[in-house]
C-alpha cells in the first residue's frame, strides 16, 4: 500500500510541476533499471527499462508485477493524441472511424504550383523577349550573308532567279527598316523609349521578327476586307451596264444575268470574261474611274489609299507594270516551279483569293491570270475587276429561321386516295342470302374472271334515311346475319 501511494504522489508531482524527471532519494539497490511512465489519457502504461539489456517491460502484464526497489521513475514522453496502434479489445476499424486521417496538403500545393506556372514571372517574360529579339537578329544576319553572295553574283554577270531576287529585295527592305532605330542609339537615354515605340509601331521591325501566327491573322483580316471590296466592285460593274443599256442592247441583260450566276457560286471562265471585257474597254480605264473605285482597287492590291486621284492612278499603273514583269518571269520559269507560299503570295498580289484553296486551285488561278494578261491582252484595270468574281465567300450561309412560331408553308400537294362511290360498295350483301337453301352453300359456284354481280338488283331509297327507319333497317340486317350463320353451321 505504501508503495502504490508513493507512486500516486509522484504522478501528481509530475503533473503539477514542470520538471520532467523525478529521481527518488532512496537508492539502496542497483540503479540498473528505470521506471518509465507515459501519462496519456488514451494510453496509460508504466514500463520498466533495463539500462544494461535495453529492454522494456510492462508491470501490468502477468509475470512483471514484482518491481525492483532500485528503479528510477522517469517521465520520457507526454502526448495529447491517440497512438495509432492496436488496442486490445477494440478492432482497428473503430479507431480509424473515431480518428480519421487528415488529408495532406499536397493536392493544394500542386494546384498552386500549376497556377504559378500559368502566370509567368517578370523574369520569365524578360527572358522570352530577349530570346525573341535574339532569334530575329540572328535570322537577319543569315539573310544578310546570303544577300551578299547574291550581290557578288550580280556583279559578275550572273542572272538570279525569281525566288533569289525576291529574297534580295526583302533583305534590303529589312535593313532600311533599321535606319529609324539609329536615332534611339544616338540620342542619350532614348533607348528606354524603344519598348513604347515598338508597341505603337510593330511593323517597323524587319520581317524576320514576325511570327507565323501574326502573318496568318493579317492575311485573314485582309481577306475579309477584299471580300467586301469585291461586292462593291461587282455592283459598280452592274451599274455601268445599266447606264449603257441603249448602246449594249441585249449584252447588258446577259451581263446582269451572268453576274447573278457568279454571285450564286458559278465559276467564270476565260472566254466569258474576254467576251464581256469588250463592253468595258473604254469605261474601265484608269482615267475614267472615280475616286471610290480607285480606292477600292488600291485596297485590293494592298496599296496606300491617301492622296489625290492622280496619285492613286500612278500607284496603280506602277503596280500593274511590276505585276506584268513578274508574270513574264513566271511564264518563263513555269507555274509548277513555285511553292505553296509563293503561289499564295502571287495570288494575293494580284487581288485573288489565297486562303481556303488547294495547291491545284492556286495554280489554276495563276494560269488563268497569265492567259488573260499575256495572251488575250485584257486591260489591267478590267483584269483586276474580273478577279473580283473569284472572291466569292466560300462559307455556307446559315438557314433563315422565321421569327414567328408558325411552321413554314410547304407547297407539297398530298394526293388523297379517291374512292368510287358505286352501289356495290355501299350495299350490304346479307339480305341476298336470306332466301337461299343449305344445298346452295355446299356447291361452290364456278370461278369466272368477270366480277360477281348479284342476281336480284337491290335498290336504295332515294330520299334520306330518317331516324324512325334506322332501327328497322338495323334489325333486318341482324336477322339476316343470324340466319346466314345458322345455315352455314347446318351445312
UniProtKB/Swiss-Prot annotation:
Q: Where is this region: Disordered?
A: 94-115, 435-491
Its keywords, alphabetically, are: Coiled coil, Membrane, Mitochondrion, Mitochondrion inner membrane, Transit peptide, Transmembrane, Transmembrane helix
Q: Which InterPro entries match?
A: LETM1-like_RBD, LETM1/MDM38-like, LETM2_N
Q: Where is the composition biased (Low complexity)?
A: 449-461
Where do the Letm1 RBD domain residues begin and end? 221-438
- Biased composition range(s): Polar residues: 94-109, 465-491
| Segments on the Mitochondrial intermembrane face | 26-177
- The organelle targeting sequence, given as a residue range: 1-25
Task: Report the coiled-coil segments.
Answer: 208-235
What name is this protein filed under?
LETM1 domain-containing protein LETM2, mitochondrial
Q: Which organism is it from?
A: Homo sapiens (Human)
Instruction: Give the gene symbol.
Output: LETM2
Amino acid at each position: 500500500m505504501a508503495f502504490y501511494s508513493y507512486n500516486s504522489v509522484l504522478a501528481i508531482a509530475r503533473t503539477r510541476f514542470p520538471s520532467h524527471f523525478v529521481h527518488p532519494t532512496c537508492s539502496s539497490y542497483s540503479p540498473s533499471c528505470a521506471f518509465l511512465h507515459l501519462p496519456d489519457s488514451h494510453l496509460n502504461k508504466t514500463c520498466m527499462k533495463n539500462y544494461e539489456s535495453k529492454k522494456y517491460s510492462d508491470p501490468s502484464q502477468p509475470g512483471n508485477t514484482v518491481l525492483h526497489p532500485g528503479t528510477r521513475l522517469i517521465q520520457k514522453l507526454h502526448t495529447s493524441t491517440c497512438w495509432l496502434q492496436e488496442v486490445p479489445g477494440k478492432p482497428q476499424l473503430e479507431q480509424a472511424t473515431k480518428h480519421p486521417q487528415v488529408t495532406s496538403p499536397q493536392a493544394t500545393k500542386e494546384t498552386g504550383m500549376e497556377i504559378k506556372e500559368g502566370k509567368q514571372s517578370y523574369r520569365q517574360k524578360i527572358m522570352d523577349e530577349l530570346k525573341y529579339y535574339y532569334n530575329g537578329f540572328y535570322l537577319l544576319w543569315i539573310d544578310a550573308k546570303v544577300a551578299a553572295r547574291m550581290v557578288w553574283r550580280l556583279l559578275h554577270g550572273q542572272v538570279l532567279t525569281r525566288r533569289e531576287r525576291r529574297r534580295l529585295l526583302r533583305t534590303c527592305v529589312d535593313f532600311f527598316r533599321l535606319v529609324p532605330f539609329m536615332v534611339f542609339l544616338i540620342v542619350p537615354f532614348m533607348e528606354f523609349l524603344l519598348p513604347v515605340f515598338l508597341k505603337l509601331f510593330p511593323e517597323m521591325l524587319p520581317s524576320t521578327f514576325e511570327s507565323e501566327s501574326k502573318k496568318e491573322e493579317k492575311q485573314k483580316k485582309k481577306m475579309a476586307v477584299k471580300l467586301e471590296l469585291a461586292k462593291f466592285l461587282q455592283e459598280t460593274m452592274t451599274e455601268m451596264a445599266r447606264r449603257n443599256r441603249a448602246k449594249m442592247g441585249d449584252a447588258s441583260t446577259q451581263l446582269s444575268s451572268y453576274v447573278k450566276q457568279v454571285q450564286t457560286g458559278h465559276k467564270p471562265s476565260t472566254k466569258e470574261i474576254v467576251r464581256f471585257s469588250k463592253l468595258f474597254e473604254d469605261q474601265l480605264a484608269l482615267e475614267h474611274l472615280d475616286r471610290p473605285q480607285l480606292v477600292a482597287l488600291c485596297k485590293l492590291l494592298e496599296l496606300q489609299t491617301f492622296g489625290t486621284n492622280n496619285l492613286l492612278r500612278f500607284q496603280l499603273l506602277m503596280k500593274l507594270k511590276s505585276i506584268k514583269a513578274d508574270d513574264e518571269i513566271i511564264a518563263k520559269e513555269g507555274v509548277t516551279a513555285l511553292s505553296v507560299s509563293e503561289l499564295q503570295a502571287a495570288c494575293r498580289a494580284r487581288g485573288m483569293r489565297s486562303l481556303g484553296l488547294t495547291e491545284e486551285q492556286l495554280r489554276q488561278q495563276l494560269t488563268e491570270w497569265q492567259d488573260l494578261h499575256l495572251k488575250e491582252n485584257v486591260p489591267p484595270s478590267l483584269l483586276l475587276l474580273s478577279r473580283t468574281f473569284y472572291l466569292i465567300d466560300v462559307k455556307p450561309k446559315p438557314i433563315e429561321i422565321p421569327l414567328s412560331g408558325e411552321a413554314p408553308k410547304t407547297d407539297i400537294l398530298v394526293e388523297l386516295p379517291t374512292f368510287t362511290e358505286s352501289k356495290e360498295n355501299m350495299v350490304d350483301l346479307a339480305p341476298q342470302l336470306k332466301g337461299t337453301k343449305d344445298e346452295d352453300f355446299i356447291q361452290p359456284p364456278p370461278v369466272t374472271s368477270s366480277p360477281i354481280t348479284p342476281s336480284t338488283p337491290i335498290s336504295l331509297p332515294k330520299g334520306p334515311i330518317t331516324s324512325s327507319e334506322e332501327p328497322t333497317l338495323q334489325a333486318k340486317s341482324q336477322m339476316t346475319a343470324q340466319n346466314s350463320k345458322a345455315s352455314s353451321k347446318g351445312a
